[in-house]
Amino acid sequence: MATKKAGGSSKNGRDSAGRRLGLKKSDGQLVNAGNIIVKQRGTKFYPGKNVGLGKDHTIFSLVSGKVKFFRKKKNRVFISVVVDDSTAA
């Protein structure tokens, strides 16, 4: 039996697309209600005032205003949206 088995295809050669995680808005930037500020896996950033936390840990704005990053206890980085009189319509 000098037959040869059919050549199989490689088990490598595929990759998943990137998930587009990270900051979408930076500190001091103006946002509207509903704008996504950060897409993340887990809570690298924590929600502060006037922001919501989605079930996939996305932080989004609840009001229009300016994005503010700050640190609190345990070196946690919090994100808030500060409502300015100039940004309120």
From Swiss-Prot:
The keyword Ribosomal protein applies. It comes from the Bacteria. Keywords: Ribonucleoprotein, Ribosomal protein. Pfam families: Ribosomal_L27. GO terms for biological process: translation. The keyword Transit peptide does not apply. Gene3D superfamilies: 2.40.50.100. GO terms for molecular function: structural constituent of ribosome. Transmembrane segments: none annotated. Residues 1-26 are annotated as: Disordered. InterPro entries: Ribosomal_bL27 (IPR001684). GO terms for cellular component: ribonucleoprotein complex; ribosome. Belongs to the bacterial ribosomal protein bL27 family. This is Large ribosomal subunit protein bL27. The gene is rpmA.
